[in-house]
UniProtKB/Swiss-Prot annotation:
Alphabetically ordered keywords of this record: Methylation, Ribonucleoprotein, Ribosomal protein, RNA-binding, rRNA-binding
Pfam family, one: Ribosomal_L11_N
Annotated S-S bridges: none
Lineage per the UniProt record: Bacteria, Bacillati, Actinomycetota, Actinomycetes, Micrococcales
Subunit structure: Part of the ribosomal stalk of the 50S ribosomal subunit. Interacts with L10 and the large rRNA to form the base of the stalk. L10 forms an elongated spine to which L12 dimers bind in a sequential fashion forming a multimeric L10(L12)X complex.
Functional note: Forms part of the ribosomal stalk which helps the ribosome interact with GTP-bound translation factors.
PTM notes: One or more lysine residues are methylated.
GO term, biological process aspect, one: translation
A GO MF label: structural constituent of ribosome
InterPro entries membership: Ribosomal_uL11 (IPR000911), Ribosomal_uL11_bac-typ (IPR006519), Ribosomal_uL11_C (IPR020783), Ribosomal_uL11_C_sf (IPR036769), Ribosomal_uL11_CS (IPR020785), Ribosomal_uL11_N (IPR020784), Ribosomal_uL11_N_sf (IPR036796)
Protein's recorded name: Large ribosomal subunit protein uL11
SMART domains: RL11
A single Gene Ontology CC term: cytosolic large ribosomal subunit
Family assignment from sequence similarity: Belongs to the universal ribosomal protein uL11 family.
């Protein structure tokens, strides 16, 4: 087994799928760690091509020799909720002004998609987390 490389940095970014380019905010974030920005952009765009339109969080691990690896996460819950509810953004005053409604089936569907990244043991717990996020955005969840 090859010797372990020393990690020098961990960068977390949220980038639109298939739309990574060296312009800010990506360029400066990677540049200060000495990563080849174009190489990352090409690799990220190739891996997220099928998910165009979504925002995909990525965790980039930078090593001492300036190489990097990255892990793609699932889209943020808020983005998935907005897409399912068909709204552009959540409510400015979530507890007084409701902007949309979601059914429990839609919430469960989002929970299944997010299950890997959520701190939940089963789908019911994951659905509760998603429902809470929806409520905080001014979207009512119907049972």
């Amino acid at each position: 087994m090859a010797p372990k490389k020393k990690v020098t940095g961990l960068i977390k970014l949220q980038i639109k799928a298939g739309a990574a380019n060296p312009a800010p905010p990506i360029g400066p974030a990677l540049g200060q760690h000495g990563v080849n920005i174009m190489e990352f952009c090409k690799a990220y765009n190739a891996q997220t091509e099928s998910q165009r339109g979504n925002v995909i969080p990525v965790e980039i691990t930078v090593y001492e020799d300036r190489t990097f690896t990255f892990i793609l996460k699932t889209p943020p819950a808020a983005e998935l909720i907005k897409k399912a509810a068909g709204v552009a953004k959540g409510s400015g005053t979530p507890h007084t002004v409701k902007v949309a409604k979601l059914t429990m089936d839609q919430v469960r569907e989002i929970a299944e998609q997010k299950q890997a990244d959520l701190n939940a043991n089963d789908i019911d717990a994951a659905a509760k987390i998603i429902a809470g996020t929806a409520r905080s955005m001014g979207i009512t969840v119907e049972a």
